[in-house]
């Protein structure tokens, strides 16, 4: 029986590197392409001596050719700090990157999974968000480069499925956190933890009453691998995330308590188009993947705090 060859785009990033850690445990050959725009070689440096692992510096928006059995398409900056820095590049990564990987998958007969996002729901009017909800996204706002880029990538995946009968899987990833998030990541959990550990004011946008649900990285990786392994007929989209909702202010107070920080909270204006609520309906994932998150927010925060202590 031949060894499975797996390609992970964005494999040096936060979620991608954790996915690689899990995949390499099986009898596979693992190829990663990453341009290190937000990813870092240090995230996978412990794998580079493994003969089953190879990483190539490559931008997914440029064509790429190889022979693989499976593709996890994760490449794209996911934090507003990064994706708004070069919005044209962000859109190109999502759209042209999807086209390149879909054409590769179609050419070699590979199964391909798209790492989509809860951002396709925008600032939702339906709560919690089900996969059948079409979303409420501002197509011309400062977040559109990411939100609409991911929505277009989903469109391309389903068009390749309908037109070429390509084996696709689409996962909609909700807020995910854990070790290996960059200290300058810019997202809420990394911001709050880093500020708390430094003892500086913790920045809260708006009044802090906006809510999110946070999924620990190991649970997310379980979901992604589980979805890739499902039978051909299951294509998605499938929500992956934690259904336990918390406000940003509650999160900040929890981090202050866990870090024993003397930081105070500083309220600043809410960014444009920032969602007021974000929480997944995961009944579909529960049913078809037999999946649900196992790590509580407190336990996940403790692990993440310990990681940041080690790198600050």
Model features per residue range: what roles?
Residues 19, 224-228, 252-255, 301-308:
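Hydrophobic "lid"/C-terminal helical patch
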Residues 125, 151, 167, 176-191, ...:
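Glycine/proline-rich active-site loop of Rossmann-fold NAD(P)-dependent oxidoreductases
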Residues 217, 237, 269-292, 303:
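Conserved C-terminal active-site "lid" loop/helix of NAD(P)H-dependent oxidoreductases
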């Amino acid at each position: 029986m031949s060894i499975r060859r797996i390609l992970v785009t964005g494999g040096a990033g936060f979620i991608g590197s954790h996915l690689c850690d899990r995949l390499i445990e099986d009898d596979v050959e693992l190829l990663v392409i990453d341009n290190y725009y937000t990813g870092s070689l240090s995230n996978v440096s412990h794998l580079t001596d493994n003969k089953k692992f190879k990483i190539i510096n490559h931008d997914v928006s440029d064509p790429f050719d190889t022979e693989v059995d499976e593709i996890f398409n994760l490449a794209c900056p996911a934090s507003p700090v990064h994706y708004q820095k070069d919005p044209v590049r962000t859109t190109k990564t999502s759209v042209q990157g999807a086209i390149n990987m879909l054409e590769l998958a179609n050419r070699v007969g590979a199964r391909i999974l798209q790492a989509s996002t809860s951002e396709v729901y925008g600032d939702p009017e339906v709560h919690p968000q089900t996969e059948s909800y079409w979303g409420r996204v501002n197509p011309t706002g400062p977040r559109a480069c990411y939100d609409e880029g991911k929505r277009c990538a989903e469109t391309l995946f389903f068009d390749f499925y309908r037109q070429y009968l390509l084996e696709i899987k689409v996962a909609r990833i909700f807020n995910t956190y854990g070790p290996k998030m960059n200290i300058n990541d810019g997202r809420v959990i990394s911001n709050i933890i880093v500020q708390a550990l430094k003892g500086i004011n913790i920045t809260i946008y708006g009044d802090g009453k906006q809510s999110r649900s946070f999924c620990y990285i190991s649970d997310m990786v379980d979901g992604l691998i589980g979805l890739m392994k499902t039978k051909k007929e299951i294509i998605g989209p499938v929500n992956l995330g934690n259904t336990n909702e918390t406000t940003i202010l509650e999160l900040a107070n929890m981090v202050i308590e866990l870090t024993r920080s003397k930081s105070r909270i500083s309220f600043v204006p809410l960014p444009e188009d920032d969602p007021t609520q974000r929480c997944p309906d995961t009944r579909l994932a529960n049913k078809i993947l037999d999946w649900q998150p196992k790590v509580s927010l407190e336990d996940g925060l403790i692990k993440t705090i310990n990681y940041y202590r080690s790198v600050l």
